[in-house]
Amino acid sequence: FWGKDLTSVQSASYLLWTIALSNFLLFISAPVIGALTDINGSSKKIFITFTTISIICVGVLFFTEAGMWVSALIFFGIANYFFSAGNILYDKILVKITSPDRYSKISGIGYAWGYFGGGLLFLINSIMFMFWESLWFENSAEAILFAFLTVSIWWFLFLLPLAITYKDEKVIQHKIQRNILVESFKKTYSTIKSISENKKIFLFLLAFFLYIDGVHTVMSSAVLYAKLLSLDDSAIIIGLLI
């Protein structure tokens, strides 16, 4: 749709490069984001800001017309970056809302409901795509565009409970921070240094990075490879649902 003037290889290549670039920027900025919010106690504010930017960018894709692949990639890349950056702060909230002995339970419940909610919306959107002729859509592309709008609205609705109920802890500043960005870099350096001195933590983080990078690669490129193999859209959707 957006890349109608591109070959399938070009479309896949540009999309993967966009994902790689946004993830690389996250890799560079993530430690600073974490340290910065630790210093000034602004996890909630920045999380909501990042998530709102992502919501807007995903919603804008609904209005992006055919052939506008550059605009689509830009909005997608921005949404991907700020979504992932927001997850850093979202994960930090866990240690603020419960005790250490309940971390695993609360985290597990959160992931379960997250997969259920995401899977439910994906199922609804898949039905819209497969049966667009029976609905109010003029073509299947219109159903896909509408799916981006539903994701944006869905995302916004489930942001509200956290935005309304959660409050950041007040950070007591013992001295005025002349340059909070410099302080965040210092804190990041201190954290990296402490990790490098602890072999077990270092190996765990390295293993997790390689594992999760593989998972994200499969998630982001599975549909592309399936399309290159000329698999039917219905078969791809069923495979993703399973």
Show where each model-derived region lies.
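Short amphipathic helix-loop junctions that connect adjacent transmembrane helices
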Residues: 1-12, 220-238
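Pair of pore-lining "gating" transmembrane helices in MFS-fold secondary transporters
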Residues: 1-4, 77, 193-218
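Central cavity-lining transmembrane alpha-helices of secondary-active solute carriers
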Residues: 12-35, 122, 242
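Glycine-rich segments within core transmembrane alpha-helices of 12-TM secondary carriers
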Residues: 26, 104-130
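C-terminal ends and interior cores of transmembrane alpha-helices
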Residues: 27, 48-69
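Hydrophobic core of transmembrane alpha-helices in multi-pass small-molecule transporters
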Residues: 57-60, 67-86, 210
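C-terminal membrane-cytosol helix-exit motif in multi-pass small-molecule transporters
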Residues: 121-134, 152-172
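Juxtamembrane intracellular "pre-TM" segments in multi-pass secondary transporters
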Residues: 167-206, 228
